[in-house]
Amino acid sequence: MAFCVLTILTNMALAAPPLNILLTNDDGYLAPGIQALRAALLEAGHSVSLIAPVTNQSGSGTSITTEGVAYTSHGNQVWSVAGRPADAVRLGIGHIMQDNPPDIVVSGINFGQNVGQDVIVSGTVGAAVTAVQLGVPAISASAEINFDEANTGFPSTLTTFPWAAALVADLIRDPRARLEGSFLNLNFPTQKKLKGFKQARLAASSILSIDFKEIDQGLWRAGYETDPGDEPDSDRTLLGEGYITITQLGISYEPVALPSTDLSWIESITIDPKAVDAASVAP
């Protein structure tokens, strides 16, 4: 069953032709976020080539594998890459899709928000940066996690994936979402808090903490800083308030100064809550 969870106030977007998409992520090609996004993109009529890491590569940024990468075809335009998200994008554009280049690279949907200074280490965002560096428009998308759900598998995030994916599938039809020299970084709140879209500046803070704890003998892990601090209008704060945040990023990771590209058209999108409820089924 198809779900259209948004209505863009111009008819141009939904009337636009389907796109040829390179879909990737940093959680791995079988992760629930990318699988939900692939299903939504196909249902929206787009042509999708899923080219993503075979294993979780979270935190890899734009790093690449210098010793070469292997890839496996799984049929139905799905390939897994023994490398990082940037490897997958480079391999996709330069080799797998060489004769059928993508109109856009879509990266996500990440299991966890990519806001503030954490975009620097994000493989999800790094894949979008890599695409734009190679001259292909891109968009990155992530779904919020509630740290209180850590012991139960983050069910709110799992139910966010389907409706967020359907929204991305419609949003990218609008050519205004496909920028040159920069890209949109989207973060989706969990459904219960959903208020709509909001253009945001990149927060100066990071979720990543430097408070390391020993989790096993000789193995240390840093925790997370869940308090966003006092940063009004930042992506981190607005996401916590229930907005789908939109941040325009340059390919050297600097936030594009606001006001920049007019993104008010995205803020004017209305979301049908009944369609969101109907789509909120974990994949």
Question: Language-model features: where?
Answer:
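Glycine-rich phosphate/pyrophosphate-binding loops
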Residues: 132-156
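Charged helix-capping and loop-helix junction motifs
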Residues: 120-126
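Alpha-helix C-terminal capping segments
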Residues: 94-99, 126-137
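Conserved acidic residues
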Residues: 103-104
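A cross-family phosphate/adenosyl-ligand binding-site feature
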Residues: 17, 21, 35-94, 100
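Electrostatically charged, flexible surface regions
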Residues: 157-282
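Boundary at the C-terminal end of the N-terminal hydrophobic targeting segment
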Residues: 13-15
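Bacterial N-terminal signal peptides
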Residues: 1-11
